[in-house]
């Protein structure tokens, strides 16, 4: 019985005290209106949980900053989308997270809404890269 209690308390401590914000592999669909094809590429992004709390009584003198799992460092990679017309730019640049942390969401570079952009899907025929 003591082992079960210890395991329960350890799991609670782990959930409360430790953040599990880390790099994860994702697949995104890339397409351009000028091109006939859509490609799916694998990249890395940040996902997980960060310790946060929402106070019952709001103090206007003290801002309540909710922390979210977001990137600390990001690099950009470029791919060529096939099937583009000769006059069209076939290059597409996308972000790749290289380091994550729990911090304030930067709405200048990130979708900070409760419900994000939704699933990534192709409108055109898909070509695996």
Swiss-Prot record:
Residues 1-18 form the signal peptide. It is found in: Secreted. Its main location: secreted. Pfam families: Cys_knot. The keyword Cell membrane does not apply. One of its GO terms (biological process) is G protein-coupled receptor signaling pathway. The keyword Glycoprotein applies. One of its GO terms (cellular component) is extracellular space. Glycans are attached at residues 25, 42. One of its GO terms (molecular function) is follicle-stimulating hormone activity. PANTHER family: FOLLITROPIN SUBUNIT BETA, GLYCOPROTEIN HORMONE BETA CHAIN. Heterodimer. The active follitropin is a heterodimer composed of an alpha chain/CGA shared with other hormones and a unique beta chain/FSHB shown here. Together with the alpha chain CGA constitutes follitropin, the follicle-stimulating hormone, and provides its biological specificity to the hormone heterodimer. Binds FSHR, a G protein-coupled receptor, on target cells to activate downstream signaling pathways. Follitropin is involved in follicle development and spermatogenesis in reproductive organs. This is Follitropin subunit beta.
